Swiss-Prot record:
Homodimer. This is Triosephosphate isomerase. The active site is at residues 96, 166. The gene is tpiA. It catalyses: D-glyceraldehyde 3-phosphate = dihydroxyacetone phosphate. Keywords: Cytoplasm, Gluconeogenesis, Glycolysis, Isomerase. Belongs to the triosephosphate isomerase family.
Length: 250
């Protein structure tokens, strides 16, 4: 039985003070109810230290939204895995659709980041997903399979990798893939992992759904056989909503 994982991606929201307050509210709202699954929050870089201190001692994990694939150097505006590790991050989100869309990340640069995260002793959340055009043209299976293959190129052991399926057309739009649509793609992803790493690895890998998950639809989505939790955007900015989603996974 795969242990479900729910991560709140706060994106570019909340000041440090607001982030600290929200983190405290999340811990309080969850109480000890998330022990059956993993729950994490991904604040902005400036808030990582403060949020990390706030959630210390709780079961809530600290997650980073991105990283660079070099250890250090002349890379203005970037943050290394060593810096994130020192702050206590357990996971790093890699290849989010917004990073691919707005900042030109490719499967190749995603792959470099995945390897760097694993080498630093953290776990990676590999994001994959199709656009509306790719969905409507029927290319979504090929697109997602290519992203999985490219992101994991040269990665021998995927035990520290979570895959997040995020239909780009359902992120921040209020639209949600039906539970059946989401399950279909999650199964495609699991089959691709089986092709690359074998059935035992495919059975063990956790695949999150990330596309406008809300308290009202979380339980139905998480009941699907190949959906192992969620990567939560907007709903993660309200402690009670996020806690309700986590509890739906537990």
């Amino acid at each position: 039985m795969r242990r479900k994982i729910v991560v709140g991606n706060w994106k570019m929201n909340k000041t440090v003070a607001e982030s600290t307050e929200l983190a405290s509210a999340v811990v309080a709202a969850l109480g000890s109810d998330c022990s059956a699954c993993e729950a994490g929050i991904a604040p902005t870089y400036p808030a990582l230290d403060s949020v990390g201190r706030t959630i210390k001692g709780s079961e809530v994990l600290l997650v980073a939204q991105n990283c660079h694939y070099e250890d250090d150097g002349a890379f203005t505006g970037e943050v290394s895995t060593g810096m994130l590790n020192a702050l206590g991050c357990s996971y790093v989100i890699i290849g989010h659709s917004e990073r691919r869309q707005y900042f030109g990340e490719t499967d190749a640069t995603v792959n470099l980041r995945i390897k760097k995260v694993l080498a630093a002793g953290m776990k990676a959340i590999l994001c994959v997903g199709e656009t509306l055009e790719e969905r409507e043209s029927g290319a979504f299976e090929a697109v997602v399979s290519t992203q999985v293959t490219g992101g994991l190129q040269g990665v021998v052991d995927i035990s520290d990798i979570v895959i997040a399926y995020e239909p780009v057309w359902a992120i921040g739009t209020g639209r949600t893939a039906s539970s059946e649509q989401a399950q279909e793609v999650h199964k495609i992803i699991r089959n691709k992992v089986a092709e690359l790493y074998g059935a035992p690895a495919a059975d063990a890998v956790r695949i999150q759904y990330g596309g406008s998950v809300k308290p009202s639809n979380a339980a139905e989505l998480f009941a699907m056989p190949d959906i192992d939790g969620g990567l939560i955007g907007g709903a993660a900015l309200k402690a009670e909503d996020f806690a309700a989603i986590v509890k739906a996974a537990c």
